[in-house]
Amino acid sequence: MRLTHVLSHTLGLLALGATAEAFSRSREAACGPKKPFRPLPTSQSRDKTCHVRSHGDGTDDSDYILSALNQCNHGGKVVFDEDKEYIIGTALNMTFLKNIDLEVLGTILFTNDTDYWQANSFKQGFQNATTFFQLGGEDVNMYGGGTINGNGQVWYDLYAEDDLILRPILMGIIGLNGGTIGPLKLRYSPQYYHFVANSSNVLFDGIDISGYSKSDNEAKNTDGWDTYRSNNIVIQNSVINNGDDCVSFKPNSTNILVQNLHCNGSHGISVGSLGQYKDEVDIVENVYVYNISMFNASDMARIKVWPGTPSALSADLQGGGGSGSVKNITYDTALIDNVDWAIEITQCYGQKNTTLCNEYPSSLTISDVHIKNFRGTTSGSEDPYVGTIVCSSPDTCSDIYTSNINVTSPDGTNDFVCDNVDESLLSVNCTATSD
Protein backbone atom coordinates (compact mmCIF):
# COMPACT_ATOMS: atom_id res chain seq x y z
CA MET A 1 0.00 0.00 0.00
CA ARG A 2 2.77 2.42 0.93
CA LEU A 3 4.84 1.56 -2.14
CA THR A 4 1.88 2.20 -4.44
CA HIS A 5 1.30 5.60 -2.86
CA VAL A 6 4.98 6.56 -3.06
CA LEU A 7 5.25 5.58 -6.72
CA SER A 8 2.09 7.42 -7.72
CA HIS A 9 3.15 10.53 -5.83
CA THR A 10 6.65 10.53 -7.32
CA LEU A 11 5.46 9.88 -10.87
CA GLY A 12 2.97 12.70 -10.49
CA LEU A 13 5.71 15.14 -9.53
CA LEU A 14 7.88 14.00 -12.43
CA ALA A 15 4.95 14.55 -14.76
CA LEU A 16 4.61 18.08 -13.44
CA GLY A 17 8.27 18.66 -14.25
CA ALA A 18 7.86 17.33 -17.78
CA THR A 19 4.92 19.60 -18.57
CA ALA A 20 6.91 22.56 -17.28
CA GLU A 21 9.03 22.32 -20.43
CA ALA A 22 6.24 24.36 -21.99
CA PHE A 23 7.91 27.30 -20.28
CA SER A 24 5.67 29.97 -18.78
CA ARG A 25 6.74 33.61 -18.71
CA SER A 26 4.33 34.17 -15.84
CA ARG A 27 6.12 32.92 -12.75
CA GLU A 28 3.17 33.85 -10.57
CA ALA A 29 0.76 31.74 -12.63
CA ALA A 30 3.17 28.79 -12.48
CA CYS A 31 3.05 28.71 -8.66
CA GLY A 32 0.49 26.43 -7.10
CA PRO A 33 -1.51 25.53 -5.23
CA LYS A 34 -0.13 28.08 -2.76
CA LYS A 35 1.02 31.47 -3.97
CA PRO A 36 4.27 33.16 -2.89
CA PHE A 37 4.39 35.69 -0.09
CA ARG A 38 4.91 38.41 -2.69
CA PRO A 39 4.06 38.38 -6.42
CA LEU A 40 6.83 37.12 -8.71
CA PRO A 41 7.76 39.33 -11.68
CA THR A 42 6.86 38.17 -15.18
CA SER A 43 9.73 37.24 -17.49
CA GLN A 44 10.14 39.27 -20.68
CA SER A 45 9.88 37.62 -24.10
CA ARG A 46 13.05 36.64 -26.00
CA ASP A 47 13.71 37.57 -29.62
CA LYS A 48 16.89 35.72 -30.63
CA THR A 49 18.46 32.28 -30.20
CA CYS A 50 22.08 31.15 -29.82
CA HIS A 51 23.19 27.50 -29.89
CA VAL A 52 26.21 26.60 -27.77
CA ARG A 53 28.98 24.82 -29.65
CA SER A 54 30.65 21.73 -28.20
CA HIS A 55 34.09 20.29 -28.95
CA GLY A 56 32.62 16.83 -28.54
CA ASP A 57 35.94 15.30 -27.48
CA GLY A 58 36.06 16.01 -23.73
CA THR A 59 37.69 19.42 -24.16
CA ASP A 60 36.54 22.30 -21.95
CA ASP A 61 33.58 24.07 -23.61
CA SER A 62 33.51 27.03 -21.19
CA ASP A 63 34.64 29.56 -23.82
CA TYR A 64 31.84 28.47 -26.15
CA ILE A 65 29.33 28.87 -23.32
CA LEU A 66 30.51 32.37 -22.43
CA SER A 67 30.48 33.38 -26.08
CA ALA A 68 26.86 32.31 -26.50
CA LEU A 69 25.84 34.03 -23.26
CA ASN A 70 27.40 37.31 -24.35
CA GLN A 71 25.89 37.05 -27.81
CA CYS A 72 22.34 36.41 -26.58
CA ASN A 73 22.36 38.46 -23.38
CA HIS A 74 19.69 41.17 -23.13
CA GLY A 75 16.78 39.43 -24.78
CA GLY A 76 17.88 36.06 -26.14
CA LYS A 77 17.83 32.32 -25.54
CA VAL A 78 20.95 30.15 -25.27
CA VAL A 79 20.37 26.51 -26.22
CA PHE A 80 22.44 23.53 -25.05
CA ASP A 81 21.46 21.05 -27.76
CA GLU A 82 19.84 17.73 -26.90
CA ASP A 83 22.36 15.50 -28.66
CA LYS A 84 25.46 17.10 -27.13
CA GLU A 85 27.53 16.88 -23.96
CA TYR A 86 29.11 20.11 -22.75
CA ILE A 87 32.24 19.95 -20.58
CA ILE A 88 32.90 22.69 -18.02
CA GLY A 89 36.41 22.82 -16.61
CA THR A 90 36.52 26.53 -15.81
CA ALA A 91 34.79 28.44 -13.01
CA LEU A 92 32.16 30.58 -14.76
CA ASN A 93 30.98 33.92 -13.36
CA MET A 94 27.58 34.43 -14.98
CA THR A 95 26.28 37.22 -12.75
CA PHE A 96 26.21 39.71 -15.64
CA LEU A 97 23.12 38.19 -17.25
CA LYS A 98 19.90 40.08 -17.95
CA ASN A 99 16.71 39.05 -19.77
CA ILE A 100 18.10 35.74 -20.98
CA ASP A 101 17.07 32.07 -21.07
CA LEU A 102 19.36 29.05 -20.82
CA GLU A 103 17.56 26.08 -22.36
CA VAL A 104 19.41 22.92 -21.33
CA LEU A 105 18.32 20.03 -23.54
CA GLY A 106 21.57 18.06 -23.51
CA THR A 107 24.05 17.31 -20.71
CA ILE A 108 26.43 19.63 -18.87
CA LEU A 109 29.29 17.78 -17.15
CA PHE A 110 31.86 19.30 -14.79
CA THR A 111 35.41 17.98 -14.89
CA ASN A 112 36.85 15.91 -12.04
CA ASP A 113 39.98 18.08 -11.62
CA THR A 114 39.70 18.44 -7.84
CA ASP A 115 42.90 20.51 -7.53
CA TYR A 116 41.62 23.10 -10.02
CA TRP A 117 38.18 23.38 -8.47
CA GLN A 118 39.49 23.71 -4.92
CA ALA A 119 41.68 26.60 -6.06
CA ASN A 120 39.22 28.32 -8.40
CA SER A 121 35.62 27.64 -7.42
CA PHE A 122 33.74 30.65 -6.09
CA LYS A 123 33.97 31.05 -2.32
CA GLN A 124 30.62 32.19 -0.93
CA GLY A 125 31.67 33.16 2.61
CA PHE A 126 29.34 30.80 4.45
CA GLN A 127 30.23 27.41 5.95
CA ASN A 128 33.08 26.90 3.47
CA ALA A 129 30.54 26.96 0.62
CA THR A 130 32.05 27.12 -2.87
CA THR A 131 30.32 26.85 -6.25
CA PHE A 132 31.30 25.63 -9.72
CA PHE A 133 29.65 28.73 -11.19
CA GLN A 134 27.69 31.82 -10.24
CA LEU A 135 24.40 32.37 -12.06
CA GLY A 136 22.92 35.78 -11.37
CA GLY A 137 21.64 39.06 -12.76
CA GLU A 138 18.06 39.94 -13.61
CA ASP A 139 15.29 37.94 -15.31
CA VAL A 140 17.37 34.80 -15.95
CA ASN A 141 15.71 31.45 -16.65
CA MET A 142 17.32 28.01 -16.87
CA TYR A 143 15.14 25.12 -17.99
CA GLY A 144 14.72 22.44 -20.65
CA GLY A 145 14.75 19.13 -18.78
CA GLY A 146 18.39 18.35 -19.57
CA THR A 147 21.04 17.08 -17.15
CA ILE A 148 23.68 18.89 -15.09
CA ASN A 149 26.23 16.42 -13.69
CA GLY A 150 28.68 17.40 -10.93
CA ASN A 151 30.93 14.33 -11.32
CA GLY A 152 30.63 13.86 -7.58
CA GLN A 153 32.15 10.42 -7.04
CA VAL A 154 35.74 11.67 -7.00
CA TRP A 155 34.70 14.22 -4.37
CA TYR A 156 32.91 11.67 -2.17
CA ASP A 157 36.09 9.57 -2.10
CA LEU A 158 38.36 12.57 -1.50
CA TYR A 159 36.20 13.89 1.34
CA ALA A 160 36.50 10.52 3.09
CA GLU A 161 40.26 11.14 3.24
CA ASP A 162 40.10 14.83 4.23
CA ASP A 163 36.90 16.40 5.58
CA LEU A 164 38.31 19.93 5.24
CA ILE A 165 38.48 19.96 1.44
CA LEU A 166 36.38 22.54 -0.40
CA ARG A 167 33.74 20.68 -2.40
CA PRO A 168 31.91 22.73 -5.05
CA ILE A 169 28.14 23.15 -4.99
CA LEU A 170 26.50 22.17 -8.26
CA MET A 171 24.15 25.15 -8.74
CA GLY A 172 25.29 28.54 -7.45
CA ILE A 173 22.37 30.96 -7.74
CA ILE A 174 24.09 34.13 -6.60
CA GLY A 175 22.60 37.62 -6.78
CA LEU A 176 19.68 36.67 -9.03
CA ASN A 177 16.63 38.96 -9.06
CA GLY A 178 13.79 37.34 -10.97
CA GLY A 179 14.30 33.90 -12.42
CA THR A 180 12.89 30.45 -13.09
CA ILE A 181 15.05 27.35 -12.65
CA GLY A 182 13.66 24.07 -13.97
CA PRO A 183 12.75 21.61 -15.18
CA LEU A 184 16.25 20.14 -14.90
CA LYS A 185 17.86 16.87 -13.86
CA LEU A 186 20.69 17.37 -11.35
CA ARG A 187 23.09 14.52 -10.73
CA TYR A 188 26.07 13.75 -8.45
CA SER A 189 26.76 17.08 -6.81
CA PRO A 190 29.99 17.14 -4.75
CA GLN A 191 28.12 19.00 -1.98
CA TYR A 192 24.78 20.92 -1.93
CA TYR A 193 22.76 20.81 -5.13
CA HIS A 194 21.64 24.45 -4.86
CA PHE A 195 23.08 27.39 -2.94
CA VAL A 196 20.71 30.35 -3.33
CA ALA A 197 22.38 33.48 -1.94
CA ASN A 198 21.58 37.20 -2.09
CA SER A 199 18.73 36.42 -4.47
CA SER A 200 15.04 37.31 -4.71
CA ASN A 201 11.92 36.46 -6.69
CA VAL A 202 13.17 33.08 -7.93
CA LEU A 203 11.02 30.05 -8.79
CA PHE A 204 12.44 26.50 -8.77
CA ASP A 205 9.99 24.20 -10.54
CA GLY A 206 10.35 20.60 -11.69
CA ILE A 207 13.81 19.73 -10.34
CA ASP A 208 14.84 16.06 -10.32
CA ILE A 209 17.75 15.47 -7.92
CA SER A 210 19.62 12.19 -7.53
CA GLY A 211 23.17 11.01 -7.01
CA TYR A 212 24.44 8.43 -4.57
CA SER A 213 27.99 7.22 -4.05
CA LYS A 214 29.08 4.13 -5.94
CA SER A 215 31.78 3.35 -3.36
CA ASP A 216 31.78 2.82 0.40
CA ASN A 217 32.32 6.57 0.86
CA GLU A 218 28.99 8.30 1.32
CA ALA A 219 27.87 11.38 -0.58
CA LYS A 220 27.68 13.81 2.35
CA ASN A 221 26.18 17.30 2.78
CA THR A 222 24.19 16.91 -0.43
CA ASP A 223 21.38 19.30 0.55
CA GLY A 224 18.76 19.83 -2.13
CA TRP A 225 18.53 23.59 -1.55
CA ASP A 226 20.18 25.95 0.89
CA THR A 227 18.79 29.49 0.89
CA TYR A 228 20.94 32.26 2.38
CA ARG A 229 20.28 35.99 2.57
CA SER A 230 17.48 35.51 0.06
CA ASN A 231 13.87 36.67 -0.16
CA ASN A 232 10.69 35.54 -1.89
CA ILE A 233 11.83 32.14 -3.14
CA VAL A 234 9.50 29.34 -4.33
CA ILE A 235 10.58 25.67 -4.53
CA GLN A 236 7.95 23.29 -5.91
CA ASN A 237 7.03 20.17 -7.87
CA SER A 238 10.35 18.39 -7.38
CA VAL A 239 11.77 14.97 -6.51
CA ILE A 240 14.84 14.83 -4.29
CA ASN A 241 16.88 11.68 -3.59
CA ASN A 242 19.83 12.75 -1.47
CA GLY A 243 21.62 12.28 1.84
CA ASP A 244 21.17 15.54 3.73
CA ASP A 245 18.55 18.28 4.12
CA CYS A 246 15.91 18.23 1.41
CA VAL A 247 15.65 22.00 1.85
CA SER A 248 17.48 24.13 4.40
CA PHE A 249 16.70 27.75 5.25
CA LYS A 250 20.02 29.28 6.24
CA PRO A 251 20.50 32.72 7.89
CA ASN A 252 18.38 35.60 6.65
CA SER A 253 16.01 33.59 4.49
CA THR A 254 12.62 35.32 4.34
CA ASN A 255 9.31 34.78 2.54
CA ILE A 256 10.01 31.24 1.33
CA LEU A 257 7.34 28.89 -0.09
CA VAL A 258 8.09 25.17 -0.48
CA GLN A 259 5.38 22.88 -1.87
CA ASN A 260 4.77 19.57 -3.60
CA LEU A 261 8.08 17.86 -2.89
CA HIS A 262 8.94 14.17 -2.61
CA CYS A 263 12.06 13.81 -0.43
CA ASN A 264 13.83 10.47 0.01
CA GLY A 265 16.85 9.70 2.18
CA SER A 266 17.17 13.21 3.54
CA HIS A 267 17.51 15.04 6.85
CA GLY A 268 14.17 16.77 6.39
CA ILE A 269 13.07 20.29 5.60
CA SER A 270 15.09 22.35 8.02
CA VAL A 271 15.26 25.82 9.44
CA GLY A 272 18.94 26.30 10.11
CA SER A 273 21.20 25.55 11.53
CA LEU A 274 21.18 29.08 12.99
CA GLY A 275 23.19 30.85 15.66
CA GLN A 276 26.38 29.08 14.70
CA TYR A 277 28.57 32.18 14.57
CA LYS A 278 29.08 34.35 17.63
CA ASP A 279 28.10 38.03 17.31
CA GLU A 280 26.16 37.40 14.08
CA VAL A 281 22.39 37.89 13.83
CA ASP A 282 20.46 35.18 11.96
CA ILE A 283 16.83 35.65 10.96
CA VAL A 284 14.49 33.20 9.25
CA GLU A 285 10.89 34.32 8.99
CA ASN A 286 7.77 33.81 6.88
CA VAL A 287 8.29 30.24 5.66
CA TYR A 288 5.45 28.03 4.42
CA VAL A 289 6.06 24.33 3.71
CA TYR A 290 3.12 22.50 2.14
CA ASN A 291 2.31 19.02 0.84
CA ILE A 292 5.50 17.07 1.39
CA SER A 293 6.14 13.35 1.24
CA MET A 294 9.18 12.40 3.30
CA PHE A 295 10.59 8.87 3.18
CA ASN A 296 13.62 7.09 4.65
CA ALA A 297 14.80 10.23 6.42
CA SER A 298 16.04 11.43 9.78
CA ASP A 299 13.39 14.16 10.07
CA MET A 300 10.39 15.79 8.45
CA ALA A 301 9.97 19.20 10.13
CA ARG A 302 13.21 20.36 11.70
CA ILE A 303 14.40 23.58 13.37
CA LYS A 304 18.08 23.60 14.35
CA VAL A 305 19.45 26.35 16.60
CA TRP A 306 22.87 26.39 18.25
CA PRO A 307 23.11 27.04 22.02
CA GLY A 308 24.68 30.06 23.66
CA THR A 309 28.00 28.35 24.30
CA PRO A 310 30.43 27.01 21.69
CA SER A 311 30.12 23.33 20.80
CA ALA A 312 31.21 21.06 17.98
CA LEU A 313 29.70 18.26 15.91
CA SER A 314 32.81 17.63 13.81
CA ALA A 315 36.02 19.28 12.65
CA ASP A 316 34.20 21.26 9.95
CA LEU A 317 30.96 21.95 11.87
CA GLN A 318 31.29 23.81 15.14
CA GLY A 319 29.96 26.98 16.71
CA GLY A 320 27.28 28.51 18.90
CA GLY A 321 26.63 31.87 20.53
CA GLY A 322 24.89 33.69 17.68
CA SER A 323 21.62 35.60 18.08
CA GLY A 324 18.51 36.32 16.02
CA SER A 325 15.05 34.84 15.56
CA VAL A 326 12.94 32.18 13.87
CA LYS A 327 9.41 33.48 13.33
CA ASN A 328 6.23 32.62 11.43
CA ILE A 329 7.14 29.14 10.24
CA THR A 330 4.42 26.74 9.00
CA TYR A 331 4.66 23.07 8.10
CA ASP A 332 1.29 22.05 6.63
CA THR A 333 0.43 18.58 5.30
CA ALA A 334 3.06 15.86 5.23
CA LEU A 335 3.08 12.13 4.60
CA ILE A 336 6.00 10.36 6.26
CA ASP A 337 7.34 6.83 6.14
CA ASN A 338 10.44 5.41 7.85
CA VAL A 339 11.42 8.79 9.30
CA ASP A 340 13.22 8.96 12.66
CA TRP A 341 11.57 12.17 13.91
CA ALA A 342 8.31 13.55 12.50
CA ILE A 343 9.13 16.82 14.26
CA GLU A 344 12.47 17.89 15.70
CA ILE A 345 12.90 21.33 17.22
CA THR A 346 16.08 21.98 19.18
CA GLN A 347 17.97 24.92 20.59
CA CYS A 348 20.79 22.60 21.62
CA TYR A 349 22.09 21.75 18.15
CA GLY A 350 25.67 20.53 18.31
CA GLN A 351 25.58 20.27 22.11
CA LYS A 352 25.05 16.78 23.50
CA ASN A 353 25.29 18.03 27.11
CA THR A 354 21.71 19.20 27.81
CA THR A 355 22.66 20.57 31.23
CA LEU A 356 25.31 22.78 29.65
CA CYS A 357 22.87 23.88 26.94
CA ASN A 358 20.29 24.91 29.54
CA GLU A 359 22.98 26.71 31.54
CA TYR A 360 23.90 28.74 28.44
CA PRO A 361 20.59 29.01 26.58
CA SER A 362 20.40 30.08 22.99
CA SER A 363 20.26 33.79 22.23
CA LEU A 364 18.19 33.00 19.14
CA THR A 365 14.44 32.92 19.77
CA ILE A 366 11.84 30.64 18.18
CA SER A 367 8.24 31.87 17.94
CA ASP A 368 5.03 31.57 15.96
CA VAL A 369 5.60 28.04 14.65
CA HIS A 370 2.66 26.02 13.32
CA ILE A 371 2.96 22.32 12.47
CA LYS A 372 -0.19 20.55 11.30
CA ASN A 373 -1.73 17.74 9.28
CA PHE A 374 1.04 15.13 9.52
CA ARG A 375 0.37 11.43 9.04
CA GLY A 376 2.44 8.31 8.67
CA THR A 377 4.89 6.06 10.47
CA THR A 378 8.35 6.67 11.88
CA SER A 379 11.33 4.37 11.55
CA GLY A 380 11.10 3.29 15.17
CA SER A 381 14.71 4.28 15.85
CA GLU A 382 13.59 6.59 18.68
CA ASP A 383 10.84 4.37 20.12
CA PRO A 384 8.60 5.12 21.88
CA TYR A 385 9.11 8.69 20.64
CA VAL A 386 8.08 10.09 17.26
CA GLY A 387 9.02 13.73 17.87
CA THR A 388 11.07 16.06 20.05
CA ILE A 389 10.55 19.73 20.89
CA VAL A 390 13.39 20.91 23.12
CA CYS A 391 14.10 24.55 23.91
CA SER A 392 17.08 25.66 25.96
CA SER A 393 14.91 28.01 28.04
CA PRO A 394 11.17 28.78 28.28
CA ASP A 395 12.12 32.42 27.67
CA THR A 396 13.48 31.72 24.19
CA CYS A 397 10.56 29.69 22.75
CA SER A 398 6.96 30.87 22.44
CA ASP A 399 3.80 30.16 20.46
CA ILE A 400 4.79 26.76 19.10
CA TYR A 401 1.62 24.99 17.98
CA THR A 402 0.92 21.50 16.67
CA SER A 403 -2.41 20.11 15.44
CA ASN A 404 -3.68 16.98 13.71
CA ILE A 405 -0.41 15.06 14.10
CA ASN A 406 -1.32 11.45 13.30
CA VAL A 407 2.10 9.83 13.36
CA THR A 408 3.03 6.63 15.17
CA SER A 409 6.03 4.40 15.54
CA PRO A 410 5.90 0.87 14.05
CA ASP A 411 4.88 -0.28 17.55
CA GLY A 412 1.95 2.14 17.61
CA THR A 413 3.38 4.65 20.11
CA ASN A 414 3.14 8.41 19.57
CA ASP A 415 5.18 9.91 22.43
CA PHE A 416 7.05 13.22 22.25
CA VAL A 417 10.01 14.61 24.18
CA CYS A 418 9.06 18.14 25.29
CA ASP A 419 11.23 20.55 27.26
CA ASN A 420 10.93 24.27 28.07
CA VAL A 421 7.91 24.60 25.78
CA ASP A 422 4.24 25.44 26.48
CA GLU A 423 2.64 22.00 26.29
CA SER A 424 -0.87 23.47 26.36
CA LEU A 425 -0.34 24.59 22.74
CA LEU A 426 0.70 21.14 21.59
CA SER A 427 -1.74 18.45 20.48
CA VAL A 428 0.90 15.75 20.94
CA ASN A 429 1.58 13.28 23.73
CA CYS A 430 4.43 14.82 25.75
CA THR A 431 5.69 12.05 28.02
CA ALA A 432 9.32 12.95 28.68
CA THR A 433 11.83 15.77 28.95
CA SER A 434 15.29 15.86 27.42
CA ASP A 435 16.82 15.04 30.81
Curated annotation (Swiss-Prot):
Q: Name one GO cellular component term.
A: extracellular region
Q: Which InterPro entries match?
A: Glyco_hydro_28, Pectin_lyas_fold, Pectin_lyase_fold/virulence
Entry annotation: catalytic residues: D244 (proton donor), H267
pH-related activity info reads:
Optimum pH is 4.2.
Disordered: annotated segments: 32-55
- Swiss-Prot/TrEMBL catalytic activity: [(1->4)-alpha-D-galacturonosyl](n) + H2O = alpha-D-galacturonate + [(1->4)-alpha-D-galacturonosyl](n-1)
Compositional bias ranges of the Basic and acidic residues kind: 45-55
Task: Please state which protein family the record places this protein in.
Answer: Belongs to the glycosyl hydrolase 28 family.
Query: What is the protein name stated in its UniProt record?
Result: Exopolygalacturonase X
Instruction: Name the species this protein comes from.
Output: Aspergillus tubingensis
Per the UniProt record, the lineage of the source organism begins with: Eukaryota, Fungi, Dikarya, Ascomycota, Pezizomycotina
Question: What's the encoding gene here?
Answer: pgaX
